[in-house]
């Protein structure tokens, strides 16, 4: 199974944007890795017999919890355990309806729906996302307003 030609670890979202734009211009396939919990190996191997790169988002892991507004801004490389810990630092009663494995990356967990033990009462983790900043396939950085209400 082909391995990546290189691994790119961005420190901010503009670095992700640059990586996507460069990959498109150079016609290099890429995989995105958030936490690495991937039973199929889709984030670190490729069935395409061409060089590819991994955009590893593990260094994008800032978490800002705002208890007054019942919100948090979580970067994609943070793990669920880090999110739970940051919430617990601010409140003994707040939670986030997500999975039970603390080492799962937030990005992969939410894009997979975000199943967890609280989802029957509070919905999936993805149901609780009210805004996001994403880099699309063309390298554009989009937020909720730019993506439109179809995504949310």
Regions found by a protein language model. Name each.
Residues 14-152:
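FAD-binding core of FAD-dependent oxidoreductases
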């Amino acid at each position: 199974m082909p391995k990546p030609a290189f691994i790119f670890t961005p420190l901010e979202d503009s670095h992700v944007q640059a990586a996507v734009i460069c990959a498109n211009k150079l016609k290099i396939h890429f995989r995105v890795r958030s936490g690495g919990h991937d039973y199929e190996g889709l984030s670190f191997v490729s069935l395409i017999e061409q060089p590819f790169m991994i955009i590893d988002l593990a260094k994008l892991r800032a978490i800002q919890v705002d208890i007054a507004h019942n919100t948090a801004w979580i970067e994609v490389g943070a793990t669920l355990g880090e999110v739970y810990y940051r919430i617990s630092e601010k409140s003994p009663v707040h939670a986030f309806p997500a999975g039970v494995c603390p080492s799962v990356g937030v990005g992969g967990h939410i894009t997979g729906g975000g199943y967890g033990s609280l989802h029957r009462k509070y919905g999936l983790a993805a149901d609780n996302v009210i805004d996001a900043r994403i880099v699309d396939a063309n390298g554009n950085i989009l937020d909720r307003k730019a993506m439109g209400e179809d995504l949310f």
